Amino acid sequence: MSVPTVLERIIARKFQEVAERSARVSLAELEGLAKAADAPRGFANALIEQAKRKQPAVIAEIKKASPSKGVIREHFVPAEIAVSYEKGGATCLSVLTDVDYFQGADEYLQQARAAVSLPVIRKDFMVDPYQIVEARALGADCVLLIVSALDDVKMAELAATAKDVGLDVLVEVHDGDELERALKTLDTPLVGVNNRNLHTFEVSLETTLDLLPRIPRDRLAITESGILNRADVELMAINEVYSFLVGEAFMRAEQPGLELQRLFFPEQVKKTVQQLD
């Protein structure tokens, strides 16, 4: 019998988590909270408009830890990081809410969103419509659907729930088969290509470059993971990829927003440093 991969263990835990949470707060209660939440901020639209101008559309991630790296950031204040990102030029935020594997929390999303005016995606492992409604109740503007964690029927069901509650969907793929499934099953304009293999956690930017020709022009290709320096950003720009999801490179920096500027808006860095002085 093969040993479950990290992704398989996470998904198994998510089913347990949904059972535990729905025993505490019913779906009907959650739907009421979702209806009462602040209006969505337009996650997809913000990215599309920025990328249209061939400007970096950056989803800046707020992440304390990961299964592959352990704790990434010791000094972790989500609201503070969110403000830093907004000042640094982020288009959107991504907040990890997975507790067991990423040391995330629902409260981190709420704290980050309350501190800024940027749209926010709930970065978690969605396996049940309950989690989608929960995301809207927490104030999220978008949810992540990971193709490798879902079959086509479940993927379509989760996307339909997202639409019902007013959430955008970012679908995440890692290879050609997953991309084909995503394009066939979902009409979301946001297609994230994760350069990290979620089974092995190995990273290669070639993943984005290989899949790019197969992503229709009416969808927005977002490269995720492994963007660490200006050369990586420039490589993507040459290939007309202007949308990025970046976490670790920022989280390891003393000032995450300043690191965002260094990577994506270097002409702004001098100005910011002068202001800080």
From Swiss-Prot:
GO terms for biological process, alphabetical: L-tryptophan biosynthetic process
Gene Ontology MF annotations: indole-3-glycerol-phosphate synthase activity; phosphoribosylanthranilate isomerase activity
Organism ancestry: Bacteria, Pseudomonadati, Pseudomonadota, Gammaproteobacteria, Pseudomonadales
Any coiled-coil regions, as ranges: none
Gene3D superfamilies: Aldolase class I
EC number: 4.1.1.48
This protein's name: Indole-3-glycerol phosphate synthase
Keywords of this entry: Amino-acid biosynthesis, Aromatic amino acid biosynthesis, Decarboxylase, Lyase, Tryptophan biosynthesis
Disulphide-bonded residues: none
Family: Belongs to the TrpC family.
Domain of life of the organism encoding this protein: Bacteria
Pathway it works in: Amino-acid biosynthesis; L-tryptophan biosynthesis; L-tryptophan from chorismate: step 4/5
Catalytic activity: 1-(2-carboxyphenylamino)-1-deoxy-D-ribulose 5-phosphate + H(+) = (1S,2R)-1-C-(indol-3-yl)glycerol 3-phosphate + CO2 + H2O
Signal peptide residues on this chain, from the entry's feature table: none
Protein species of origin: Pseudomonas putida (strain ATCC 700007 / DSM 6899 / JCM 31910 / BCRC 17059 / LMG 24140 / F1)
